[in-house]
UniProtKB/Swiss-Prot annotation:
GO molecular function: small ribosomal subunit rRNA binding; structural constituent of ribosome
Entry protein name: Small ribosomal subunit protein bS20
The organism's place on the tree of life at top rank: Bacteria
Gene name of the record: rpsT
BP term (GO), one: translation
GO cellular component: cytosol; small ribosomal subunit
Matching InterPro entries: Ribosomal_bS20, Ribosomal_bS20_sf
Species per Swiss-Prot/TrEMBL record: Methylococcus capsulatus (strain ATCC 33009 / NCIMB 11132 / Bath)
Length: 92
């Protein structure tokens, strides 16, 4: 454990930041899972709505430094591909 006051403060801040980041990361994963579950259920409108809700959450995670922008782009691309595949499947 730290002995210097500033080190103690940084330890407290690090713990608070860790908890906050964990909550944000959990929210991110939840929204991504909602899209995947909606696609797997075969409900196109539900999947599209879930995707529309997930995109701003993914983008805000990048702005907060939670994930890298390339990971965000990859996640959005893969989710969108799933939704589009469902739309094509529903159309045919």
């Amino acid at each position: 454990m730290a002995n210097i006051a500033s080190a103690k403060k940084r330890a407290r801040q690090a713990e608070n930041n860790r908890a906050h980041n964990a909550a944000l990361r959990s929210r991110l994963r939840t929204y991504i899972k909602k899209v995947i579950l909606a696609v797997d259920s075969g409900d196109l409108t539900k999947a599209q709505e879930a995707f529309r809700q997930a995109v701003p959450i993914i983008d805000s995670s990048v702005n907060k430094g939670l994930i890298h922008r390339n990971k965000a782009a990859r996640s959005k691309s893969r989710l969108n591909a799933r939704v589009k595949a469902l739309a094509l499947q529903a159309a045919s």
